Design a protein with these regions (language model features):
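Conserved small-residue
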Residues: 9-18, 23-318, 322-363
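Twin-arginine (Tat) signal peptide motif
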Residues: 1-7
Length: 363
């Protein structure tokens, strides 16, 4: 079976199962599932799987593979292999997910300037990213290493057209001592930022927060390859849809403007549709963008201040991607039944003098 046929069959099968509300091996075009003796993944006859990364496995840099793998992307390596950059959504109190081992015994093997937050040597950031080099011909892992160290709660993010991964911290925490998850937690740095990881890096990148992209509980990012604008989601009940306009297309540390989406004809639109249908399904609405100030705040209130400025409110913005001049995003608990919403933002480049999509429509 060709890959395209497999994907089409799997998709159609999934749609039929969803429509019928049942899951049955008789309805599958691939046959009955066979029990996996390792109790990891049951597959039909003729299918197999390969584990290329496993929590607590020893990596090539001498550190352990962190737990809680989350958002990731694959990049073409210069040698023909594939580099997979993977987030790890870990809290610093969760020592058992750490790359440094449970007692931080491996922490001294990493240069201090490559650890964003060492947590005074007690509770370093246990999130960050790992990079896996994979040989698609031999179907095996070549090497794996930490590529971003000392951050926390790295949830989703997004790949850039210039070959990097934007790793998003889904948290908002401050330096100091606190008691979390029944443990004393020490932090040296502020968290709630986006970090850029070069997918070709053979070791950890210097961890530099992109402060111009805002400090809030980041979820995911999608890059408009034409303009370089970056769209950002926020996983909160009262979240905004953000847009970052970089001063230089592929140099995010050079700063830029952070904005939030607003409905042109109704200020502070609540798109959640919890109490009433403010936004009708399938109907296009003209939008504009509101410039935000104090984007690196001391309080986790950027979304609240943006709403007061007229920005639209979303119900837990999460997944986001760019395709064919549009940006698609999901709101996890939107809608009357709180089962989720999908939005499409159509970029209108004709009204833009700087090709940044200064106006557009959303449905």
């Amino acid at each position: 079976m060709q890959r395209r046929q497999f994907i089409q069959s799997a998709f159609l099968s999934g749609m039929m199962l969803k429509a019928s509300g049942t899951v049955s091996a008789q309805n599958s075009p691939f046959g009955e599932l066979r029990a996996d003796p390792r109790k990891i993944l049951d597959l039909p006859k003729g299918f197999s799987y390969t584990i290329i990364s496993e929590q607590h496995g020893l990596m090539d840099d001498g550190l352990l593979t962190p737990g809680q793998a989350d958002g990731m992307a694959a990049f073409q390596n210069k040698n023909g292999n594939i580099n997979i950059v993977c987030n790890h959504e870990n809290h610093p109190a969760n020592f058992h997910y750490s790359a440094f081992d449970k007692n931080n015994s491996l922490m001294n093997s990493v240069e201090k300037n490559l650890i964003y937050d060492a947590g005074e040597g007690i509770t370093p950031g246990t999130g960050g990213t790992t990079t896996i080099e994979y040989d698609p011909v031999a179907r095996k892992k070549i090497r794996q290493h930490m590529s971003l160290i000392g951050t926390e709660y790295n949830c989703a993010g997004g790949a850039t057209p210039w070959g990097s991964w934007l790793s998003c911290e889904e948290c908002f925490t401050d330096p100091g001592t606190s008691f979390e998850r029944k443990k004393v937690v020490k932090r040296e740095k502020r968290h709630g930022y986006i970090f850029e990881v070069n997918a070709q890096s053979n070791g950890p990148v210097k961890p530099e927060p992109i402060r111009a992209m805002g400090r809030f509980e980041h979820e995911a990012a999608a890059v408009d390859p034409i303009s370089g604008a970056i769209y950002l989601t926020e996983d909160k009940h009262r979240s905004l849809l953000y847009r970052f306009l970089p001063n230089v297309k592929n140099k995010l540390q050079d700063g830029g403007i952070l904005q939030a989406l607003s409905f042109s004809k109704k200020s502070s639109m609540d798109t959640r549709n919890w109490d009433k249908e403010n936004v009708k399904v399938g109907e296009w609405y003209e939008v504009k963008w509101v410039n935000l100030d104090n984007i690196d705040p001391d309080k986790n209130d950027l979304r609240l201040r943006g709403y007061e400025q007229g920005a639209a409110r979303f119900a837990r913005g999460e997944g986001i991607c760019y395709a064919d001049n549009s940006v698609f995003l999901t709101a996890t608990i939107g809608g009357f039944e709180r089962m989720g919403q999908v939005f499409e933002y159509r970029i209108n480049r004709e009204l833009s003098e700087n090709s940044q999509g200064a106006a557009g429509h959303i449905k």
